[in-house]
Amino acid sequence: VAGLPIHRLLGTCRSRVPAYPSSHWLDIPEAYAEQALHYRSLGWTAYKIHPHGSPKEDVEICRAVREATGDSIALMLDPMWSYSYEEALRVGRAVEEMGFFWYEDPLAEDDIYGYVKLRQKLDIPILATEYTPGSLYGMAEFVIRQATDILRGDVAVKGGITPLVKIAHLAEAFR
């Protein structure tokens, strides 16, 4: 349309946006640490960890990456809906102590009550989920109930650019 990129059609408000690489599942904590160091050597300033889903092992992975990188990059943890509330709280406290930037999707995507409790107990920002039941309306419920600190949208999951614009407006309205 009009020969313009989408960001221009939507009314560009930034000249740059932060980005980060994410891990895939690696065999051992040291492999995550090596991957984070590799990305840092390429100029990345943040790294998101997708661990195995076992709380004890996941904390070991996070610790290995933090020890390898020091405070030179922002770290985020996304265990992809792997934990019970008690496990999520325990892991959340551990990554909070390690200075992680955010904690994403620790609980099932429909556990709003668990996310509310987790947010009340932890200081680390909670990012709950791009897979909310009910799409935009599910995200609104997370915001209204204060179950998340950060909204995340995925164009492939949410149904295109228009739903993402609506999510951005929702986030802006409840800033």
Please place each PLM-identified region on the residue numbering:
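N-terminal capping/lid subdomain adjacent to the active-site entrance of alpha/beta enzymes
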Residues: 1-76, 80-97, 121
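Catalytic alpha/beta core domains of metabolic enzymes, predominantly
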Residues: 110-175
